[in-house]
Amino acid sequence: MDVLRNNQAGLSGLAQLQALMVANSPPPINETMGFVLIEIEEGRAVFEGNPDRSVYNPIGSVHGGYAATLLDSACGCAVHSKLAADQGYTTLELKVAYHRPLTEASGPVRAEGRILSIGRRAAFAEATLTDRDGRLCASATSTLLVFPLERPATTA
């Protein structure tokens, strides 16, 4: 997804994320970590992933960073879905609680993010990560900065 191009086209955050899903063109982080955006609506985003041994830590379970990345993506895209074409966001803080370990047998896993509140400069979101049986594996709260996107200079 080329956010800058979509911004120039005047697409809202929700329209940008919907276009990403239709084009089946995930950002590189999704390919690297093996997860995909499967649902998007205003204020809500759902990702699905299949953790495998490539994301294991030294003790034989999925590294916490995998769960944190999914939760951060779910929170961020929930916020992105409510932004105008001329707005961007970035995570300021992510607090993750790990409830149970993940292994490759846990998948597919599902991260669902929701907006708690959004203002002109800050947004607050939460997300849950559940395993194939619907058990809570991790949860997160996030504070995100909302900012205006600069328009690229046009050439004459």
Show which residues each predicted segment covers.
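Terminal targeting signals and extreme-terminal segments of soluble enzymes
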Residues: 1-156
